[in-house]
Swiss-Prot record:
CDD domains: ATP-synt_F1_beta_C (cd18110), ATP-synt_F1_beta_N (cd18115), F1-ATPase_beta_CD (cd01133). Keywords: ATP synthesis, ATP-binding, CF(1), Chloroplast, Hydrogen ion transport, Ion transport, Membrane, Nucleotide-binding, Plastid, Thylakoid, Translocase, Transport. Its main location: plastid. ATP binds at residues 170-177. GO terms for biological process: proton motive force-driven mitochondrial ATP synthesis. It is found in: Plastid, Chloroplast thylakoid membrane. Its EC number is 7.1.2.2. It comes from Cressa truxillensis (Spreading alkaliweed). One of its GO terms (molecular function) is proton-transporting ATP synthase activity, rotational mechanism. HAMAP family: ATP_synth_beta_bact. This is ATP synthase subunit beta, chloroplastic.
């Protein structure tokens, strides 16, 4: 049964304070705590370490194992510096609960739901436990529908499923952050939805950069924080493995409230899902479990499934999740990315080659995939257009070696025409972003799916063969490309 959000604060009641234990062993971020007989805490209960002379250390731990001899083993959510054997530990009687609702927008939280942005306490008494079961099958919305993003290359070639999971693959500096911010902006404007960003085990500098860029682009409104479109939850790579393992659940819990109670469409970003697995692996070793393949935890599939199954569409609203996936040593057979792939509905692959050409978003049109690109789901017209675009780009890719050695003149008339159209398509797949207006000076464009299909059909039909390829670069719909061509001629 799903546990509902509670309207109680995080204070420990006087009754619960009586359930005190003592630290008997500390190994890094793992604590063993002894409790009186018959007063053992439950698995996933939050424990709070009490300092000497009632000085609160504010180290929250989560019960992971019950060992026998009235001992439990718990994982700390923050540094264990300064802890000693014999210190008192309070069993709160509940699992970690975090603030939820509109008051979380525009704020930055840690794994415990505590604000870390120095903007004061969160203006809400509504909290929700981070451990919940996935929605029952009868609550799910099984209708397959496209989640329109307004980004041409995504909507045409690798469309997102409403309530689906998308893997975002790309190295450093190819535009992951800008793409994420544009999606946050577009869901707010086109769908009236909100976003939750979970920074799992990534660099603190990147989290800070993202926050600053969101403020610059208006995704976070400093003047009126309530008008912000995103809540941020961070558990960065300098934090203990317990925090990195649970921060994804904290972000998901906030997203679930917007879906189930506010009945909104929510975009949940997890950067990086590999770090979630990595943290689980560290915790598993510390808890003394036997490692599985490549040293990963034996519970890898279960942990991933528990998180991913909560990300879904219900009859109230949807959570569409975009997860950055780091592939260790580019080995796609590694258990961490391989387990992630089993849950994904679409993949968006960012290409360094396209970024080097200045084509943004640098989404690789041939490597990006989607299970939604089927005629029975997207319709014959969309499917045919997407397939013809891919065929044209694939043929251009095959001819590039010949062009590099012999030049364009050695190609047949038909191949020269294919190359010309492919270059127009490649440029038309770029588009100006709203969140990049600050840097580019070009106003952002949201292009509807019907407009996108019409534009590519016109290029493929040959009607625009006479226009220069520069006219298709960084424009919105096809009418802007023809207008730009007229300007270039004059």
């Amino acid at each position: 049964m799903r546990s509902n959000p509670t309207x109680s604060g995080s204070e420990v009641s006087a009754v619960e304070k009586k359930n005190l234990g003592r630290i008997v062993q500390i190994i890094g971020p793992v604590l063993d705590v002894a409790f009186p007989p018959g007063k053992m805490p439950y698995i996933y209960n939050a424990l709070v370490v009490q300092g000497r002379d009632n000085e609160q250390m504010n180290v929250t731990c989560e019960v992971q194992q019950i060992l026998g001899n009235n001992r439990v083993r718990a994982v700390a959510m923050s540094d264990t510096d300064g802890l000693m054997r014999g210190m008192e530990v309070i069993d709160t009687g509940v699992s970690i609960s975090v603030p939820v609702g509109g008051a979380t927008l525009g704020r930055i939280f840690n794994v415990l739901g505590e604000p870390v942005d120095k903007l004061g306490p969160v203006d809400t008494k509504t909290t929700s436990p981070i451990h919940r079961s996935a929605p029952a099958f009868i609550q799910l919305d099984t209708k397959l529908s496209i989640f329109e993003t307004g980004i041409k290359v995504v909507d045409l070639l690798a469309p997102y499923r409403r309530g689906g999971k998308i893997g975002l693959f790309g190295g450093a500096g190819v535009g992951k952050t800008v793409l994420i911010m544009e999606l946050i902006n577009n869901i707010a404007k086109a769908h009236g939805g909100v976003s939750v960003f979970g920074g799992v085990g990534e660099r603190t500098r990147e989290g800070n950069d993202l926050y600053m860029e969101m403020k610059e682009s208006g995704v976070i409104n400093e003047e009126n924080i309530a008008e912000s479109k995103v809540a941020l939850v961070y558990g960065q790579m300098n934090e203990p493995p317990g925090a990195r393992m649970r921060v994804g659940l904290t972000a998901l819990t906030m997203a679930e409230y917007f879906r189930d109670v506010n009945e909104q469409d929510v975009l949940l970003f997890i950067d990086n899902i590999f770090r979630f697995v990595q943290a689980g692996s560290e915790v598993s070793a510390l808890l003394g479990r036997m490692p599985s393949a490549v040293g990963y935890q034996p519970t890898l599939s279960t942990e991933m499934g528990t998180l991913q199954e909560r990300i879904t569409s219900t009859k109230e609203g949807s959570i569409t999740s975009i997860q950055a996936v780091y592939v260790p040593a580019d080995d796609l057979t590694d258990p961490a990315p391989a387990t992630t792939f089993a849950h994904l509905d679409a993949t968006t692959v960012l290409s360094r080659g396209l970024a080097a050409k200045g084509i943004y978003p640098a989404v690789d049109p041939l490597d990006s995939t989607s299970t939604m690109l089927q005629p029975r789901i997207v319709g014959e017209e969309h499917y045919e257009t997407a397939q013809r675009v891919k065929e044209t780009l694939q043929r251009y890719k095959e001819l590039q070696d010949i062009i590099a050695i012999l030049g364009l003149d050695e190609l047949s008339e038909e191949d020269r025409l294919t190359v010309a159209r492919a270059r127009k398509i490649e440029r038309f797949l770029s588009q100006p972003f709203f969140v990049a207006e600050v840097f580019t000076g070009s106003p952002g464009k949201y292009v509807g799916l019907a407009e996108t299909i019409r534009g590519f059909q016109l290029i493929l039909s040959g009607e625009l063969d006479g226009l220069p390829e520069q006219a298709f670069y960084l424009v919105g719909n096809i009418d802007e490309a023809t207008a730009k061509a007229m300007n270039l001629k004059t």
